[in-house]
């Protein structure tokens, strides 16, 4: 199901494929801090036109743990992009040197263009404001590892649900499971209508809320996203929203004992740092699971049948 496939959007993947990915990632956990030769001789090219810490490092670590090598760049500085080379030509060059390409770009559709140009499989490491499929896969994998299942859970998404690219992909991923999804944000920061229409058509159960306190007692998972300055064209709008939705120890007094708090990171002040040492904090575990999850993804795409 996975061999040779591009990973551009979550809409291309169903429940069966995700469950196969999760089982493979669980197997890969034992190799996440060692090195095996599953992909010896394979090369991954990374083309990160936007800043990244966790996504880039976890992809690079994953490939090296699998026995492969990594080439590429992080920012356009010092590359032919600075000289005016087109995205398509850059991808063609990387395609000639590698077996798989990971791209991050500020423009929506950049990963799709790369996939159309390249013969090698292309993985979207985040493009535009609406797609980050491997983060959504990681988010679901963390939930699956934490609870042993996804069906039947009440999952809250809180913060900037319009401009956070992780939210769009996560909603599309959740549409493969029987969950209740609580969208907690100001009305003007709800997910875009096109995404909501799609997940509703898939049967995802949604409710809208402006205050986390009114639903915190119902949630099994609370997924928090920061207000992203770089996604706002109007700095006044950013200042107005920043810090509006924050998780504190006081709020958690009403939460279920097993509530898992997730965050794609980096955080600013939307999660009180005093929560880091509570059983609710799963965001650092979530980040750590990025390596075995991406090991599994790369392995499934590149491995022989």
Swiss-Prot record:
One of its GO terms (molecular function) is aspartate carbamoyltransferase activity. It holds the Pfam family OTCace. Pathway: Pyrimidine metabolism; UMP biosynthesis via de novo pathway; (S)-dihydroorotate from bicarbonate: step 2/3. It comes from the Archaea. It is an enzyme of class 2 (transferase). Its EC number is 2.1.3.2. L-aspartate binds at residues 83, 165, 226. It catalyses: carbamoyl phosphate + L-aspartate = N-carbamoyl-L-aspartate + phosphate + H(+). Coiled coil: none annotated. Gene3D superfamilies: Aspartate/ornithine carbamoyltransferase (3.40.50.1370). One of its GO terms (biological process) is 'de novo' UMP biosynthetic process. Keywords: Pyrimidine biosynthesis, Transferase. Heterooligomer of catalytic and regulatory chains. Belongs to the aspartate/ornithine carbamoyltransferase superfamily. ATCase family. Catalyzes the condensation of carbamoyl phosphate and aspartate to form carbamoyl aspartate and inorganic phosphate, the committed step in the de novo pyrimidine nucleotide biosynthesis pathway. This is Aspartate carbamoyltransferase catalytic subunit.
